[in-house]
């Protein structure tokens, strides 16, 4: 299928009353906006067409659903008060923007040299990142917001899958709720994993929907985790970092892992 035929199919699926769709021929993107809020999303067509040609139809449908749910959520008034149980931390790369596209400052705190902690209000199928404006409107302090979000993330389930490679154990958490990486902020979870580890505990948060713990007992384990983190990072919808973290007493230290060698901090 050629790009223009694909574009028309996508436009048809995203047709809604109150929305506008503009095509950027130079960038091969669609800009979908809500007429009332003037907010919207930009959809890159070439990567989407590539997925369709690989018969990854579910991925194409998910991208369209994300756009639709996102625009619908933008039209809703969001408040922190009354949503105390729906506030969660989200992990982002240190290079993630600190402002929204309409210039509002996002609330965040430093996490590691590679990562930041932002805060979000869960809206069911999506969430919205909390801005300074929203925080000030609530009358809350940042410390109270952070404590509430951290408390809530501890209440989330922790569905791990375990695998073993060359004497090293790997634990994969993937709940697909948007907060998989956020669970690294649950200190009780990190402590349990440290106590459980026979060798060196290493963690990876390659993208927002993945959290990996590894109990490393030999050089092969470091190499496998390094490759794994890089692969997950490249496949994530919202990448965080390809660098794993040495875990010591609950603290995370980013490390470079060279093939067949132990990491140097």
Curated annotation (Swiss-Prot):
Matching Pfam families, A to Z? DUF1444
Membership in a protein family = Belongs to the UPF0354 family.
> What name does the UniProt record give this protein?
UPF0354 protein ABC2771
Species, as recorded = Shouchella clausii (strain KSM-K16)
* Matches recorded under InterPro entries: DUF1444
